C-alpha cells in the first residue's frame, strides 16, 4: 500500500530541468520504480535532437523549453549546470506559483541563492547525491531552504530513497551540510 507521500509523488507532475547526467539518472530511477507516470513527466535538455531521443526512449514529454516544463509541474527537479542556474531560474520565474516544490541537485548553489533569485516564498530542497548514487549505493545530503517544511523534505527524501536513486539520505543540521559537501567533493578524503 502506498503512503500519502508516495501517492503525491505518483499523482504529481514532475519537471526535470536538465535531464543530462545526474538528472537523467534520477529520472530513469523514478520511472523504473514507478514513482511517477511517464505521461506526468516533462524533462528538458539543451538540444532538440536529444529531447526527441529522450521522449522516444522514455515515453515522456521532453523539450528544450524549461518554462513549458514547469508550467504544470508540482515538483521541479533542478539538475542543470551551476553556471546555468541563474538564467534557468529567471526563465521559469513567471511559471512559479505557490504549491510548487523545487528539489535541486545542482552543485555549489545554495538554497538561499535560489530563493533570492526566485524572489518569492517557494520551498526549495537541496539534494546533494554523491557519485555512487549512480548505482544506488551512495549517500545524499538534504538541506531545506527557509520556506521548505518537513513535508517538503520528506517528499524529496521519499522520492530519492524509493527510487534507490539517492542511496541513503541524511538531513544534517545547519552548518554540517557544508562539511558533507566538502567530503563528497574530495575523493581522497573517502579513500
Where are these regions (language model features)?
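NAD(P)+-binding Rossmann beta1-loop-alpha1 motif at the extreme N-terminus of oxidoreductases
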Residues: 1-64, 68-71
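Short coil/turn residues that cap or connect secondary-structure elements
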Residues: 18, 77-84, 184-187
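Mobile beta-alpha loop/short-helix "lid" or hinge segments that flank ligand
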Residues: 19, 122, 126-134, 164-178
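Rossmann-like NAD(P)(H) cofactor-binding subdomain of soluble oxidoreductases
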Residues: 26, 48-49, 58, 66-71, ...
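Residue-level recognition of oxygen-bearing side chains
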Residues: 68, 176, 186
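Internal alpha-helical scaffold of NAD(P)-dependent oxidoreductase catalytic cores
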Residues: 113-123, 139-173, 185-191
Amino acid at each position: 500500500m502506498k503512503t500519502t507521500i508516495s501517492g503525491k509523488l505518483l499523482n504529481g507532475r514532475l519537471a526535470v530541468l536538465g535531464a543530462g547526467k545526474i538528472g537523467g539518472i534520477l529520472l530513469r530511477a523514478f520511472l523504473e520504480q514507478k514513482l511517477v507516470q511517464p505521461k506526468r513527466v516533462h524533462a528538458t535538455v539543451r538540444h532538440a535532437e536529444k529531447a526527441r531521443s529522450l521522449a522516444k526512449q522514455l515515453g515522456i514529454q521532453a523539450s528544450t523549453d524549461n518554462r513549458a516544463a514547469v508550467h504544470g509541474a508540482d515538483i521541479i527537479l533542478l539538475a542543470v549546470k551551476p553556471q546555468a542556474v541563474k538564467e534557468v531560474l529567471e526563465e521559469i520565474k513567471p511559471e512559479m506559483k505557490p504549491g510548487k516544490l523545487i528539489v535541486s541537485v545542482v552543485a555549489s548553489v545554495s538554497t538561499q541563492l535560489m530563493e533570492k533569485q526566485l524572489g518569492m516564498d517557494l520551498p526549495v530542497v537541496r539534494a546533494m547525491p554523491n557519485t555512487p548514487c549512480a548505482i544506488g549505493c551512495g549517500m545524499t545530503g538534504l538541506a531545506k531552504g527557509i520556506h521548505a517544511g518537513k513535508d517538503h523534505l520528506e517528499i524529496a527524501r521519499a522520492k530519492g530513497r524509493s527510487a534507490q536513486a539517492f542511496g541513503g539520505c541524511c538531513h544534517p543540521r545547519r552548518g554540517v551540510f557544508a562539511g558533507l559537501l566538502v567530503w563528497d567533493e574530495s575523493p581522497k578524503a573517502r579513500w
